[in-house]
């Protein structure tokens, strides 16, 4: 931990002692205590949690130095891979509108890909479930726009289609390009028109938020490459890319992400097929179970901590490198958001994120809502 990060953690203790900042309408002492403890232990610089149960609690600081002020309901986070859910949602909307065939080879929409001339069988849905055979190598990691797309379109799968689940950011880069081509818009404009606008998500963007006073700062240990200004993309590929890409790295607030998750739960704004696609297991093999763009409860998971929660087999969840996690569980009538600035790495912070989701999902006195401790989930 750097001196700057140490000072931040020390300053956060003062906020913890005052009990954090509550913006919600439900008393959840266990949630507040857990958030304060995770900040005090240096796992996170700050956290904002919100849920359909009425939770809305903030803890810690917005920046690495305490003079940046505390986290608030307006704090704007780099979602990292949680942003993949926004790409998936846009694809689902195009599918519901009849403009996207998720069972078609993805090369029908990206004909310049090297596989287009090789009778490609990898479908759009395969990309969304990370089962098409691509690995997470990133040969397109360059700031040269021409080279970026040449390398992206030359990338080949390393496994047979449908053989296994293998998380790969390039899958969602391809999906983002498909959205652009079907809408004739950049991702930010497409999302504002089709998704964020209808949901009232006015504080979400795919663009950088360098001059936004609510932008959250992330520790140097969370990213590669040059030092970022507050509000620049944390992910190195997103930072170097010529424009926003579908692998994530949107910026948003807990309020906006709760609007998105609550709509997934209530199914009110969009066609039924939009929701069904994202809640239906499209890949179930080797202990991994995935819907279109989301992880689902299974024997294994992208992150083991998810399998140790009480979420049902209908639940969907996604996490991001920077420290966030969102979940929607129809059987528990729950939607929850954890946005945070992790400082201790993925392995040490994934369990605590799941614990915070559980603490919000649990109904006091409800059967089957016993929560697991973050340290147990992290095993």
Where are these regions (language model features)?
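Short, gly/Ser/Thr-rich active-site loops of penicillin-recognizing serine hydrolases
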Residues: 281, 286, 299-303, 345-379
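N-terminal export signals
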Residues: 5-24
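Short, well-ordered beta-strand elements
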Residues: 57, 323-343
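A short acidic/small-residue loop/turn micro-motif
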Residues: 17, 62-66, 342-345
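Short, surface-exposed loop or secondary-structure junction motifs
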Residues: 56, 60-61, 116-315
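Short, conserved catalytic-motif segment at the N-terminal edge
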Residues: 25-77, 150
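Short active-site loop at a secondary-structure junction
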Residues: 41-47, 67-126, 159-170, 245-248, ...
